[in-house]
Every structure is written in C-alpha cells, then in structure tokens.
C-alpha cells in the first residue's frame, strides 16, 4: 500500500487531510522486472510504481541495481548485447518494452537527471554521437561531434 500514512499521522495528532496515492494509476510501473547481464543477475522481480507528477530519487550503494533499473525505463538495455530483460515496464499504462514501441519516443518522454554526469561506457565520440544517431542523423556525424565538442570548449582537450 504505497504512501498510505493516514493512520500513523492521525495517531500523532496531525491532519488527516493528506493525499494518498492508493487509488491513483501510476505513470511509471514495473512488474516482476528482472535483468541479467550474461549469467549475472542485476535485479530480480522488482515491483515499482511512480505516481503521476512526482519526483523520485533512487538512492543506494554502488552495484545495487539503480542504473540497471533506470536503463529499463529508457530502454538503454536494448543496446547491451548481453542484457536479458524479463517482466513489464509500463509508462502511462503502455508496455514500453514491445518491439512496436519506439525507444526514441520513450527517451523523449522520460527524463532523468543524475547527480554526476554519467557518460555511457563508450568513447567520447560515441557519447557525443549517441543523441544525433538515435534521432536518425547518420550523415555528417563527424562534423556534428566536432562542432559539439568545439562549442563545449573541449575539442583541444580530447
């Protein structure tokens, strides 16, 4: 029962006029979500719900599955050949893991902000080219990457 603290609040003498999310459809939800990389299970049978218009923080020690879970929300695990994803991830009631769902559209609609920049485990070139590439810009990638790095004032550093 998510976010139902009315009993403990009323016992503490606090207002019972609070919002509960028990009857609200989640905007983002996982059911029995399991992810493995090769033979290594990263997360197992995760049940997770995010109510509409909420902000969620995932906090935990290194290696506990936070990044793996996030990669399920934006379908980045699709790009990892050894990744096996089982279970359901729904956004606005729609299963986003099906082959008929465009991962680019999902990435436009689900935003993530990290405390520290977290480049993909690829070269600088591949990290910069990733955005244009998933948006169908395959021509002139070299020029796009160089221009982007120059505008960020790091071309001479890399």
Question: Positions of the model-derived regions?
Answer:
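ABC-family P-loop ATPase nucleotide-binding domain
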Residues: 1-34
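Short coil-to-beta microelement around the adenine-binding A-loop and adjacent beta1/P-loop entry
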Residues: 27, 40-41, 104
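Conserved beta-strand
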Residues: 30-33, 41-54, 87-89
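The feature captures the beta-strand-to-loop junction immediately N-terminal to the Walker
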Residues: 59-61
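Short helical segment in ABC ATPase nucleotide-binding domains corresponding to the A-loop/adjacent helical element
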Residues: 74, 125-134, 142, 146
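Conserved catalytic motifs of ABC-family nucleotide-binding domains
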Residues: 78-81, 112, 117-126
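ABC ATPase NBD coupling module
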Residues: 82-84, 95-111, 134
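Conserved ABC ATPase "signature" region
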Residues: 88-95, 136, 140-158
């Amino acid at each position: 029962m998510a976010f139902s603290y009315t009993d403990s609040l009323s016992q503490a003498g606090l207002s019972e006029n609070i919002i509960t999310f028990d009857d609200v459809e989640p905007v983002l939800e996982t059911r029995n979500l399991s992810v493995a990389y090769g033979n290594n299970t990263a997360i197992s049978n995760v049940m997770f719900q995010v109510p509409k218009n909420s902000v969620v923080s995932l906090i935990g020690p290194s290696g506990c599955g936070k990044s793996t879970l996030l990669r399920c929300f934006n379908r980045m695990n699709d790009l990892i050949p050894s990744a096996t994803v089982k279970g359901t991830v729904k956004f606005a009631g729609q299963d986003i893991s099906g082959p008929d769902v465009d991962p680019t559209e999902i990435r436009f609609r689900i935003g993530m902000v990290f405390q520290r920049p977290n480049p993909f485990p690829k070269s600088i070139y591949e990290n910069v080219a990733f955005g244009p590439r998933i948006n169908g810009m395959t021509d002139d990638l070299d020029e796009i990457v160089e221009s982007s790095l120059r505008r960020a004032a790091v071309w001479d550093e890399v």
